[in-house]
Amino acid sequence: MGFAEGLSAAVTARADWARDLLCQLIAFRSTTGAEGAVQEYLAGFLSSLGFPARPAPVDESIVEDPDYTAVPGHKGYRGRPNVIMDVAGAGGGRSVILNSHTDVVPGPDGMFEAKSENGIIYGRGACDAKGQVVTILLALAALRDLGVRLRGNVEAQFVIEEEAGGNGSLAVLAGGRLADAAVVFEPTGLGVHPANRGAAWFRLSVAGRSVHMGRYREGVSAFDEMIGLVAILKRYEAYLRDASKGYPGYPDDPSPVVVNVGRVRAGDWPSTLPGEAVAEGGIAFLPNRNARRIEEEVRARIAAEATPWAREHARFELAGLRNEAFETPAGHPAVLSFHRAAESVLGPQELKGWVASCDGRLFFHRGGMPTIVFGPGDLGLAHSLDERIEMEDILSAAAVLATFLVDWCDVEGKE
């Protein structure tokens, strides 16, 4: 039996183990800010298997880091550690970080009672991202079952607070945890993504002059001014899409570039001209832009296109989520190695940029590491009331990861 066949058999032999672990993880209501119990369980579970795992507390000083994302209602990091698992190599190989997160978005009570039917696991976090955690552990367990010892070090990171902006991964990086490459696991549908689009939230406000509507000529409606400002944002969206056409690895139609106005509020009384209007939303962009340039370009358009009143009284700023786009060169050895591994298990694979953002950008920009995003599961099901994942996809993803680790880290005793 060749290595590929032996690996496939080792992964398949642990299918029930992986299913049961995923169902157990889903049972924890680990919404952002409440990850403590699942992290404690995971650290204990790994130690019971003989994997060297430890809690890594998040220092409260992380809130002062320039890359920190403010979290509404933040109550501190006490009792909410990251969990780090170090698999020491024999020496002489390249190292890698494997990262995913255990926090989930909220859901109704029933979503935290995992259901397994016909090879599909249902529940909150099934694909985003507790199924990713299981994928990492399944790959490492299968290699150990085969008696494979890698030459390079592997560090598996199971982090908190990804859904709120990536502060768990930021804390790991701030602590100096680096490697020769990083693979961040998210539900990419088994697609290999060495690039991600970026996303940034914004706040646009404009002051008016509030008066009784019977004296409307003496006032200025902030809402009317906001209508014009939103039109400027949509024209900027068209400009940004045009500037991004043909960018390698991303589709033109539908374009992943979006300016979304998600919430608007204005005024406080039906018969009064509103004295302030506020719009909040998000901008999705490709690696041909960064967040600072987006902010500068929108401000310049407001200065050039808005009414005289809005030019003086409007304010646009990026606020909250600020995920930069990133792009690891397709020819980088880590990308080539992972691409080969994926094709050996899954068949022909096209390298693409992922049309979502995640912690991968921190490993690339902050850590300076070649970074790949990969994993089983459908992004369209993440955060949904029908969140689910196919066990077959978890097995395939684990086989891809194990194949990559053997190639990238090298194996002790290999001729």
Model-assigned labels for residue ranges:
Residues M1-G6, S48, Y77, R203-E415:
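Metal-dependent amide/peptide-bond hydrolase catalytic core
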Residues G2-Y122, L150, G368, D378:
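Acidic/His- and Gly-rich active-site-bordering loop/insert found
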Residues Y68-K75, L190-G191, Y247-G249:
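Short, P/G- and charge-enriched loop/turn segments at secondary-structure junctions
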Residues L98, E117-A164, R203-V206, Y216-E237, ...:
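Alpha-helical metal-binding/catalytic segments enriched in His/Glu/Asp
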Residues H101-V105, P187-L190, G198, G267, ...:
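Short glycine-enriched loops at secondary-structure junctions
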Residues D103-E117, P194-S205, R340, I372:
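Acidic-glycine-rich active-site phosphate/pyrophosphate-binding loop
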Residues A129-W201, P251, C409-E415:
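Acidic/histidine-rich catalytic neighborhood of metal-dependent amide-processing enzymes
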